């Protein structure tokens, strides 16, 4: 079952431990009503919902205490109450019962991943995992892959035009990456073949970072043995791999449209528009997901805990996945409104990440 460590990025309200059972029950009803409808809930409705018979006036007194603790607040448009982000964090960490996936849901992910896994394409497996995850959680599914950790198996240069070639990098995990390369004038096909042979003799089993270091040394030592144009092809090929940190990681997003469902107000629409913009530009998303790579199990970032980009009003639930050596090679999860169905989403993300690890031999 999924586990999740409390992430104390915000100061927990004082006195939570002193909440009595009646206060917890009223608070739970406010949160569960919010997660179900997105709407504030008033004392009259709560007095009908709770198991213990209490008058609306008594409920209002408890709500005033909860508000004092920073767990709920009154939006200016309503007499009802909504949970604060700190309240949601308290609910997720202390009160929520994490559910379990149905057998049908497990099979839905497992059968599809097994099918693409047989095709030996990591990218296809990631894509399928995201499609299933976004479908089951009704949120946007995201994966961050650490491409720089992929160990190389093979490289090939394919000429596209007289002064342009495609560099095809194949990883040991089956991942394929293509980059377009500008060639020096007058490069013959023999130079492309020689460059491929030179590189393949030295890069197999190395990560991109290791291969770059190895090749810089090898080029300096073996310069006399190589044709000048071949040297230029190799140098250009190595340069094309080192396109900066953003190229070392790949962010894939599926299920954007889920974020447009069930919007309640213009401010919801504005929040989703900002989120789309962040996902499109990768602004902060890569950093946020990267923080989950160092943790075991599911990590949950609620609202403004997503300090790295403008995700207030949104939550992120992510889990790392591993390769055959047990090394974490990426992070899988979902991004959605703060009123995500946490009890359902947490085990789903956990299961998908475990399946992906198994598929990759982890």
Swiss-Prot record:
Any GO BP annotation: negative regulation of DNA-templated transcription
Listed InterPro entries: GAF-like_dom_sf (IPR029016), HrcA (IPR002571), HrcA_C (IPR021153), WH-like_DNA-bd_sf (IPR036388), WH_DNA-bd_sf (IPR036390), WHTH_transcript_rep_HrcA_IDD (IPR023120)
Ranges in coiled-coil conformation: none
GO molecular function (one): DNA binding
Keywords from the UniProt entry: Repressor, Stress response, Transcription, Transcription regulation
Family named by the database record: Belongs to the HrcA family.
The protein's role, per its UniProt record: Negative regulator of class I heat shock genes (grpE-dnaK-dnaJ and groELS operons). Prevents heat-shock induction of these operons.
Protein name: Heat-inducible transcription repressor HrcA
Species of provenance: Bradyrhizobium sp. (strain ORS 278)
């Amino acid at each position: 079952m999924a586990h999740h460590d409390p992430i104390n990025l915000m100061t927990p309200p004082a006195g939570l431990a002193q909440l009595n059972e009646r206060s917890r029950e009223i608070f739970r009803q406010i949160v569960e009503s919010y997660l179900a409808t997105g709407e504030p809930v008033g004392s009259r409705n709560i007095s009908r919902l709770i198991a213990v018979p209490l008058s609306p006036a008594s409920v209002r007194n408890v709500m005033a205490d909860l508000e004092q603790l920073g767990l709920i607040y009154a939006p200016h448009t309503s007499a009802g109450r909504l949970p604060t982000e700190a309240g949601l964090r308290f609910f997720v960490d202390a009160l929520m019962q994490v559910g379990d996936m149905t057998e049908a849901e497990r099979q839905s992910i497992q059968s599809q991943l097994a099918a693409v896994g047989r095709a030996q394409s990591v990218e296809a497996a990631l894509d399928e995992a995201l499609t299933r995850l976004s479908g089951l959680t009704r949120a946007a599914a995201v994966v961050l892959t650490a491409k720089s950790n992929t160990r190389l198996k093979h490289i090939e240069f394919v000429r596209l035009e007289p002064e342009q070639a495609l560099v095809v990098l194949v990883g040991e995990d089956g991942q394929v990456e293509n980059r377009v390369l500008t060639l020096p004038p007058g490069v013959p096909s023999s130079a492309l073949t020689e460059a491929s042979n030179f590189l393949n003799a030295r890069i197999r089993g190395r990560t991109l970072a290791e291969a770059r270091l190895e090749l810089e040394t090898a080029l300096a030592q073996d310069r006399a043995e190589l044709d000048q144009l071949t040297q230029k092809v190799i140098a250009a090929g190595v340069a094309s791999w080192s396109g900066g940190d953003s190229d070392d990681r790949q962010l894939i997003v599926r299920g954007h449209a889920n974020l447009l469902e069930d919007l309640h107000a213009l401010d919801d629409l504005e929040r989703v528009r900002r989120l789309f913009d962040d996902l499109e530009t990768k602004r902060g998303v890569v950093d946020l997901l990267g923080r989950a790579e160092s943790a075991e199990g599911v990590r949950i970032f609620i609202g403004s805990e997503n300090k790295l980009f403008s995700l207030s009003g949104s939550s992120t639930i992510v889990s790392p996945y591993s390769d055959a050596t047990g090394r974490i090679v990426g992070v899988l999860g979902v991004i959605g409104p703060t009123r995500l169905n946490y009890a359902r989403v947490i085990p789903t993300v956990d299961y998908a990440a475990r399946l992906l690890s198994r598929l990759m031999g982890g």
